[in-house]
C-alpha cells in the first residue's frame, strides 16, 4: 500500500475514549423552516454499550461526524465508515437528500450546514436516543459530490464563526458548481483544519481538476492532502452500482483493492 502526502501535518481534533461500543441507528426527518420546511431525512448512527454492559459504560458525550454522500450513492454504501468510527465513540450523521439524478449541490450543502446545529438540538432533547450524548465538536466529511457540498457548508459556517465545526475531511472531493456555487471558491473562506484524500487513478474526479484546486484555495493554517497511489474514486465506500459503473468508464490503472484503499484511509483518518 502506497501513498503520497503533502504536507505531513496531523491534528488530533477530538479526544475520544479508547473503549469500544456497539452501534445503534435511528432515522429522523428534520425540517428547515428557512427553506419552506424542507424535509431532510437523516440516518444517525451512535454508540451503545456492548452486550452485557450497563448504559453507564457509555463514556460520552461523543463528537459528531456529519457525512455527505456522493452522486447517486446511497448513504448505506458508507457502512464501512460507521463500522470504523462509531465503535470508537463517534456519532455519524448521514442526510439522505439529493440522492436522485437532478441534484442541487447548494441545497445539499445547506442541508449539511443545517444539521450541524440541528444535531446539537437533538442531543438536548430528552425524547431523543442521543440525549446527552452529543459533543459540541463536529467534523464535516463527504465523498465526491458530498465532499464538495461539505465545503459549501463549511464556507458559510466559517464566515459566521460557528463554534461547533472543528475540521473538514474530503474523500475524492468533487467540485460542486451547480447554481453558480463553487467548492473551489468556497475553500477560500474555510479556515478550519482540513484533510483531503484522493486516489491517484481517480478518473471520475481527477485530483488536478477537483481536489488540488480546493486544497490550494483553503485558508486553513493546518491542511493536508493525501494521494493514495493506485487508488480509485469509489473505493472509499462499499460497492455501489452507479459509482462503480462511472469508475469503470473513466478510471485506468487502479492497482490496489478496495480493502487496501480503505485501510490506508482509516490509518490517516484515525490519526487526524
Regions found by a protein language model. Give the residues of each.
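Sec-dependent signal peptide recognition
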Residues: 2-10
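N-terminal signal peptide c-region/cleavage motif recognized by signal peptidases
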Residues: 13-17
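Short conserved active-site loop signatures built around small residues
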Residues: 20-66, 91
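Gly/Ser-rich "nucleophile elbow"/oxyanion-hole loop immediately N-terminal to the catalytic nucleophile
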Residues: 55-61, 106-148, 156-160
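The conserved beta1-alpha1 loop
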Residues: 63-70, 96, 172, 198-199
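Short amphipathic alpha-helix adjacent to the substrate-entry channel of hydrolases
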Residues: 73-99
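The feature captures the conserved acid-bearing segment of alpha/beta-hydrolase catalytic domains
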Residues: 162-233
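C-terminal catalytic-base region of ester-bond hydrolases, centering on the histidine
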Residues: 215-272
